[in-house]
Amino acid sequence: MKLGALSLCVFASTACAFDIDDFLDRLDNTLTLSVFHDNVRARLSGTLDLEIYHFEQPPPGLINSSIDTLFNPRLTLFLDTQVGSQIYFFAQSRLDRGFDPSNHGAQLRLDEYALRFTPWDDGRFNLQVGKFATVVGNWVPRHLSWENPFINAPLIYENVTPIQDKSAPVSPLNFIYGLYYYEKYAFNPVIWGPSYASGISVSGRLDRVDYAVEMKNASLSSRPESWNVTENGFEHPTFSARAGFRPNEAWNFGLSGSEGPYFRREAEPTLPPRRDIDDYREFVLGQDASFAWRHLQVWVEFYEARFEVPRVGDADTFAYYFEAKYKFTPQLFGALRWNQQLFGNISNGYGRSVRWSQDLARIDIAATYRFTTHTQLKLQYSFQQETTGPGDDNHLIAAQLTVRF
């Protein structure tokens, strides 16, 4: 009797999923527009993400919540417009509780918008202007919920460090221990997620080599509100670049670099006398590789970063991760990621050399089941631990249901 009831529930759920899938297919056709003999094509699409997190306090990464269990819904809309073969425009807007998971109220944002000009069909040159993700590294192309094997980002993109962009430390000890006294969002990671800063980029592909160079209005570590050109102009630009080499279809190698000031304008009064924002910069050097063979995909990134910190000196850090995804069936795949971030030493102002933040390691395990071409469920467990100092740890359990249309 119980087996029959369970079979009936599974059958009903599957039938319901395919009914929704059929509706979303019809919706996709409705949201696609083509005019002027197909010379102008526009498509509106999106994803609805329903996320739930359970963690220990303080919350890991960029999660901003005073409660241990957080429900985080997000509606993302994409607009893609192609005019002829040379002009392309895209935009991304979101309705959620903040750029990063939080227990704040709802907010509507325009996260990305850009105009791209491609004069030649072979893709050797593209000129792009607007607000868009950084060209650095190989994680950004898969950072959206449908493509990302995990619910969160690698450690380097979300681990908050003692770096502050709104004020300068008054002493080395204030710099080292600031994380214990101020709320987490006063501080910055090395790279803040996909870094949707505003600017201009040039990119292209020449045979087996691809390249991208960008000038942005904010550094890779900058917070989301700094990415808007109305909030932060181009007085102190950041320059980033990536060069990639693909020897064959399976392998892809890349080298990235970035350099620019990381302080916001309001930090200027807190800087030492006769110093300005341009005197303190963030330097990032990155190496990445990816491999794909049959049902297996592997990604790896290494980052070396240096922050020039007032009254402290150079603060160096090294971070890396290995990520693997395996497709067990056309609908089920699993993923495993190992992350680590190590911090260098600075003078504490009293003749001793100390680590400027605790080294950290994290393992992420995730499984995704794709019910249809429009719906998927993702489950994740993460364990994070300090490998130096007191050895604090944190467990994260998360689930994400995504509907794509």
What is each stretch, according to the model?
Residues M1-G4:
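Bacterial N-terminal signal peptides that target proteins for export
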Residues L6-G61, T118, F405:
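N-terminal periplasmic/intermembrane-space "pro-region" immediately following the signal or transit peptide
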Residues D19-F23, E56, G61-N64, N103, ...:
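Outer-membrane beta-barrel pore domains
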Residues T32-H54, S65-S221, E235-S240, G244-N252, ...:
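Outer membrane beta-barrel
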Residues I191, N232, G313:
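Glycine- and other small-residue-rich loops at beta-strand/loop junctions that grip anionic moieties
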Residues P194, S201, E214, E231-E235, ...:
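Short, contiguous, pocket-lining structural segments
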Residues M215-H236, T387-T402:
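C-terminal/domain-terminus segments
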